Amino acid sequence: MPVCVMMAELDEKLLLQFETQELEAPGGIATPQVYSQLLVLYLLHNDMNNARYLWKRIPQAIKTANPEMAAIWAVGQRIWQRDFPGIYSAIAAYQWSESILPVMEALRESTRRRAYGLVAQAYTSISAEDFAAFVGYSVEEAVKGVVSHGWQADPNTRMIMPQKPDPPPVSLVPNEQQLARLTDYVAFLEN
């Protein structure tokens, strides 16, 4: 089983465990560690709605007493605003605890993968400086990264030409099934 699949399953189990701990907390208020872990896992899964609602549920006293939680939420705000350079700077700006650091590193890499995918879909060419800010690398590291992805980098113009991703396979619906579906729609419209 690939490592990324195993990590995703582990993250899902951790997420469910922390959600259960929050729900079963005595008095309805969980520990700051549970809230912090749950918030950062929501961010890792890009589940911004649950992250926002969790932030609203956390008592103000816990938010103010735990600066790490505020730093996690600062990262979440940058994700919400789709401020990719801000995400990397917010992650780098805080000295994370041992329990949060691995998840933040995974979040940084996940954000980079998403940025690569977005650039590949949206751009035919992008300046090396803009791309470097978008993926949180120096210009030299960004150029090395795109070359390793099979993209082209022009050192004269300092432009990067992404390779377009392969289109997702189109699932062909058998003709009989398509005809049955069309018949159902027409029958619905007539009645």
Curated annotation (Swiss-Prot):
Q: Which UniProt keywords apply?
A: Cytoplasm, Nucleus, Signalosome
Coiled coil segments of this chain = none
| GO process annotations (BP) | COP9 signalosome assembly; protein deneddylation
Say yes or no: keyword Nucleus present: yes
Where in this chain does the record put each PCI domain?
Answer: 6-179
Per its UniProt entry, which superkingdom is the organism in?
Eukaryota
Q: Name one Pfam family in it.
A: CSN8_PSD8_EIF3K
The question of whether Nucleus is a record keyword is answered with yes
Q: Where in the cell is it found?
A: Cytoplasm; Nucleus
Entry's Gene Ontology cellular component terms:
COP9 signalosome; cytoplasm
Q: What's the subunit arrangement here?
A: Component of the CSN complex, probably composed of cops1, cops2, cops3, cops4, cops5, cops6, cops7, cops8 and cops9.
Query: Its family?
Result: Belongs to the CSN8 family.
Q: What does this protein do?
A: Component of the COP9 signalosome complex (CSN), a complex involved in various cellular and developmental processes. The CSN complex is an essential regulator of the ubiquitin (Ubl) conjugation pathway by mediating the deneddylation of the cullin subunits of E3 ligase complexes, leading to modify the Ubl ligase activity.
Which protein is depicted?
A: COP9 signalosome complex subunit 8
